[in-house]
Regions:
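Anionic-ligand-binding alpha/beta catalytic cores of soluble enzymes and soluble regulatory domains
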Residues: 124-208
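Active-site histidine-anchored catalytic micro-motif
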Residues: 4, 29-34, 49, 61-70, ...
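A conserved acidic, glycine/proline-rich C-terminal tail/linker
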Residues: 192-266
């Protein structure tokens, strides 16, 4: 099933013509495509972030939607170019470099095919080695979204189990304590989004208004430790105060009401940034 929707994501930014070129290639293949943008502000080369933003988004798009994600520091190398079919019958066109990690874990991938560049590479670009986003991914995505090719015509089938995956931090739950990673930021506002799911946090039996000891480490270095209130939303604490909350993806978040937690405490993201939440009794 194809629905003529094409959603683009990259680390290209919008300061030059790269994204516009991708759009042009897609519309040249099918002028009736409806093209939308997830984001083009992924931190350059940050595959983990690209993977997370797909996970943040795909569930809210209809069945049959085609996504093109280009965060490709290995462009021109031997890494594979693939199309993954999700459990919701959506398609993700991307390099097989870890971009599919969060989709595989949290959404589900039912099949994956390697893009045959003989059939699905834009003509006369075989000597272009640094812009697969235009010549392979946008082009193949447009063909798929428009129904000009089927998923089976993308190329040979690969094993879903062989998809390149990024390492993730497993949540640890102990008595009155839960540990996870700071996966990503709510970028504009500087809130921290952790890997700890709502269900995992609920093992601590929290009630709104409870206080928790929050500890953040970067590798083995202590970065932050303080007592923080758990609330429904930011207004449950005074302006400038920290708050624990469940975010829109049902993960535990840490924010400052009308402030940036990340900037205030110089906190980063990724598997080297870990967070511990301990319930304060009494």
């Amino acid at each position: 099933m194809n629905n003529n929707l094409l959603v683009l994501q990259s680390d290209f930014g919008l300061v030059d013509g790269a994204v516009s070129a991708m759009i042009g290639v897609a519309l040249e293949e099918s002028p009736t495509l409806k093209i939308h943008h997830l984001t083009h502000d992924i931190t350059p080369y940050n595959i983990f972030e690209g993977s997370y933003r797909l996970f943040q988004t795909v569930d809210y798009w209809p069945e049959g939607t085609t996504f093109v994600s280009v965060v490709d520091p290995g462009v021109g190398s031997k890494r594979k170019s693939v199309v993954a079919k999700t459990a919701k019958n959506q398609y993700i066109v991307t390099p097989d470099n870890g971009t599919l990690s969060f989709i595989k874990k949290h959404v589900g991938i039912v099949a994956i095919r390697e893009i045959s560049e003989v059939a699905n590479r834009r003509q006369n670009t075989e000597h272009s080695y640094t812009f697969n986003g235009r010549d392979v991914y946008a082009y193949t995505g447009a063909k798929l979204a428009s129904g000009h090719i089927t998923f089976e015509e993308v190329g040979p089938e690969l094993s879903v189990e062989q998809i390149v995956e990024l390492p993730v931090v497993a949540t640890i739950i102990e008595d009155h304590l839960v540990k996870g990673a700071i996966d990503i930021l709510d970028v504009r506002f500087g809130s921290l989004w952790t890997s700890i799911t709502r269900e995992e946090f609920y093992k601590l039996e929290p009630e709104f208004g409870d206080r928790f000891e929050v500890t953040i480490y970067h590798a083995d270095m202590l970065v932050y430790q303080n007592q923080v209130v758990y609330g429904k939303s930011f207004a449950d604490v005074r302006i400038g105060q920290p708050i624990l909350y469940i975010n829109s993806l049902y993960r535990l978040g840490l924010a400052i009401n009308q402030g940036s937690f990340a900037k205030a405490y110089n906190v980063g993201v990724g598997s080297s940034w870990t967070i511990e939440i301990k319930k304060i009794e009494g």
